[in-house]
Structure formats: C-alpha cells, structure tokens
C-alpha cells in the first residue's frame, strides 16, 4: 500500500469513527417524542428591606414592589427598622409591609439587621413559606417586571 493511500485510509477511518454515533442518534430522535413542558410553578418571594432613618424613600420602594406585574399574593414585604429615630416603621407599615423594629446600639449595621429579620421570619412563618428572598436597599425603586 502506498503511503498516500494509507493516509487517505486513516483520514476516512477517522471521519467514520467521529460521525458514526450519528447513525444511532438520528433514527432514535425521529421516534422519541419530546417531553411536554409543564407550566412553571409560581414562586413565593419574601422581600427584605433593612432601613435606618429612611422615611423619605421607604414608601416609594414599597409602592414599586406592590406595583409588580407578578401576583401580589406571592410577594410578602418585610422591613426591619434598625435603630430608627424617625417614622420609617410607621410609613412602611402604612404602605403594607410587615415591620419589625430593632434597637441594638451594640450591634449596628445591615448584616445584624438582616440576621435579626430572618430570625423573626423563621419564628413567625412556617418553614417553606417562601421559595426565595430578595434583599433590597431602602433607597431603591424597582421596575414593574423586576420579579418576573
């Protein structure tokens, strides 16, 4: 066998090996029906907001959450009023949020506040009440399709 014929044979063999799996998968794909896709289950969200003296912006954020194009009964808004000296808690409650108040001058900061809030939610709501948590700053405003 000449060297060029040997090289041609090796190249043809390599291509045959590389593409031979298609001889199995193409006929199989003709007979297998695709799985029917289910409608996705809507998820329940808990929106967590840590706020400290945010009376001027907290209402606007809660209103933007309530204006979501996602089913309102699947969204619960929680606000932790952390060491506030203004009426942030009252404004948040008036806009429909569940409000917890925290007074701890020793452990100050968003991390402590969110930890406190998560402990309160775990105590007051059964496990599995929410599929996901969304953490927002009090000075945010979200678009109507943010959750979807």
What residue ranges belong to the model's regions?
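Active-site beta-to-alpha loop of glycosyltransferases that engages the nucleotide-sugar donor
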Residues: 49-63, 83
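A conserved acidic beta->alpha catalytic loop
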Residues: 81-89, 104-106, 141
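N-terminal membrane-anchoring/stem segments of glycan-assembly enzymes
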Residues: 1-41, 94
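Cell-envelope/extracellular polymer assembly enzymes that use nucleotide-activated donors
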Residues: 43-46, 76
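Short beta-strand-to-loop acidic/aromatic patch adjacent to the donor-nucleotide binding site
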Residues: 125-141
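Conserved donor nucleotide-binding strand/loop of the catalytic core
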Residues: 74-75, 89-125, 132
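Acidic helix N-cap motif at the loop->helix transition within catalytic regions
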Residues: 59, 86-93, 145
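Short, acidic, metal-binding catalytic loop of nucleotide-sugar glycosyltransferases
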Residues: 63-74
């Amino acid at each position: 066998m000449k060297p060029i014929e040997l090289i041609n044979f090796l190249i043809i063999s390599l291509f045959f090996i590389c593409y031979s799996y298609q001889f199995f998968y193409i006929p199989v794909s003709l007979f297998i029906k695709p799985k029917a896709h289910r409608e996705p289950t809507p998820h329940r969200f808990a929106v967590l907001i840590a706020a400290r003296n945010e009376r001027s912006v907290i209402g606007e954020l809660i209103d933007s959450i309530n204006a979501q194009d996602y089913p309102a009964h699947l969204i619960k808004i929680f606000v932790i009023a952390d060491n506030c000296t203004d009426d942030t808690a009252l404004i948040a409650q008036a806009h429909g949020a569940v409000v917890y108040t925290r007074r701890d001058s020793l452990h100050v900061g968003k991390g402590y506040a969110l930890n406190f809030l998560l402990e309160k939610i775990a105590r007051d709501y059964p496990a599995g009440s929410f599929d996901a948590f969304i953490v927002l700053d009090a000075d945010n405003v979200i678009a109507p399709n943010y959750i979807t």
